[in-house]
């Protein structure tokens, strides 16, 4: 992530005001800057149990002016989605300085270690499903 992504003060404030939110990342086409006007908004988060994802989607929808929002819990997400968020994502909010960097390092490190093993597993399953 060479250049900082510009986020509206309203988007940052929405994230700051979300109880229990520790990290919010924008990823997908809007983070890669290859979106079109109808593209959805892909957000990923890490939060404590105090965080209310449903309420947050409502808040963020009002902030970005769209109800086309995907919200991914990074504590429950698989290795590939965590890697893609780490690779392409932009930190909108982090409760503590360096939180996003630590997440990105851990996600990339895991994927680099596990990708070949996971790919072999996927290939084996697909081979069994193919008639």
Task: Locate the predicted segments by residue.
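Catalytic core of pol beta-like nucleotidyltransferases
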Residues: 1-23, 31-37, 47-131
């Amino acid at each position: 992530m060479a250049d900082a992504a510009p986020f509206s003060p309203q988007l940052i404030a929405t994230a700051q005001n979300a109880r229990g939110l520790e990290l919010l990342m924008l990823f997908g086409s809007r983070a890669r800057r290859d979106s079109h006007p109808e593209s959805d908004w892909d957000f990923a988060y890490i939060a404590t149990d105090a965080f209310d994802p449903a309420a947050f989607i409502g808040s963020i929808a009002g902030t970005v002016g769209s109800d086309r929002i995907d919200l991914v819990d990074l504590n429950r997400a698989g290795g590939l989605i965590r890697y893609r968020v780490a690779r392409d994502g932009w930190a909108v909010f982090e409760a503590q300085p360096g939180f996003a960097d630590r997440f990105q390092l851990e996600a990339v490190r895991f994927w680099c270690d596990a990708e070949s093993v996971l790919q072999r597993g996927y290939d084996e399953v697909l081979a069994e499903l193919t008639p």
